[in-house]
């Protein structure tokens, strides 16, 4: 696929997501809460998870309206997790997406409430009164809940907090980041796939693809934390080193970590090749984008 075609597709889908978020994240919530939510989720971020949802849905000729709802719900969960992760009781960060973190701008209480509200809104978006079949609705809710709950993102963050100052082996580090970061990216792929017809072999291959790009994203994050500055990243660089957190760079070394990211990208491409899907080019390009990004 030509890079211009992919870039055009990315811009169009990002605009679709941005318009949907503008519509669903209301500014009229009580006591200014809507403004805090909009600050947290609008006008920033790569929208990678929504792009994975929509690329997977298109790969299986899925329902575009359902895929857009799934894409927005995943981004709301991601945004809520960033708001909470940045708070002083967690990672205590002051910069996110090139601007002050939510608790720095609005205070800890409003940040906590905004995160809670976005989490709830994510599931409201997935449960419309009409226009989506109950089985699809149930499947999407289950995928997102499992990815974001105790056995997924929240559990991974708990491991992350408990691992400060500790040396994890590669298996333990993979497990932590699979939960904290990887499963939501994998769920994004599977939520998109759920929006259309796909046989068991294709679903298994897409799950493998999602697992590979999910872990690759975190490996690249670890690399960028030591190779880029805060202005490029849009968040505080060097935080993992400063907080003595285990990373793939600290465990494997920079060169080996970079090679590992490329190996995972190759695994993602191999999974797509065995999926039997003829419209998976955008997923392949997203795997490249994840590994080759600079922020």
Predicted feature locations:
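Charged C-terminal helix
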Residues: 293-295
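N-terminal amphipathic/basic leader segments beginning at the initiator methionine
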Residues: 1-25
């Amino acid at each position: 696929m030509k890079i211009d075609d992919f870039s055009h597709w990315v811009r169009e889908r990002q605009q679709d997501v941005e318009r949907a978020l503008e519509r669903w994240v209301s500014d009229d919530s009580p006591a200014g809460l809507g403004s805090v939510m909009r600050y947290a989720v609008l006008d920033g971020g790569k929208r990678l998870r929504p792009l994975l949802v929509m690329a997977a849905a298109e790969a299986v000729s899925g329902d575009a309206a359902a895929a857009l709802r799934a894409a927005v719900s995943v981004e709301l969960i991601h945004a809520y997790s960033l708001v909470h992760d940045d708070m002083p009781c967690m990672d205590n960060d002051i910069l996110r997406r090139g601007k002050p973190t939510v608790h720095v701008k609005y205070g800890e209480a409003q940040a906590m409430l905004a995160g809670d509200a976005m989490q709830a809104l994510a599931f409201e978006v997935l449960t419309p009164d009409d226009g989506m079949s109950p089985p699809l609705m149930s499947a999407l809710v289950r995928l997102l809940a499992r990815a974001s709950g105790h056995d997924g993102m929240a559990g991974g963050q708990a491991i992350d907090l408990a691992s400060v100052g500790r040396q994890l082996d590669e298996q333990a580090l993979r497990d932590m980041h699979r939960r904290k970061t990887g499963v939501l990216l994998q769920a994004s792929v599977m939520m998109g796939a759920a929006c259309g017809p796909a046989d068991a072999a294709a679903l298994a291959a897409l799950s493998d693809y999602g697992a590979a790009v999910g872990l690759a994203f975190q490996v690249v994050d670890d690399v960028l934390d030591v190779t880029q500055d805060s202005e490029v990243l849009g968040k505080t660089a060097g935080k993992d080193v400063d907080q003595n957190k285990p990373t793939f760079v600290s465990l494997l070394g920079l060169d080996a970590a970079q090679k590992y990211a490329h190996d995972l990208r190759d695994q993602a491409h191999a999974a797509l090749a065995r999926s039997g899907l003829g419209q998976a080019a955008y997923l392949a390009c997203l795997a490249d984008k994840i590994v080759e990004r600079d922020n």
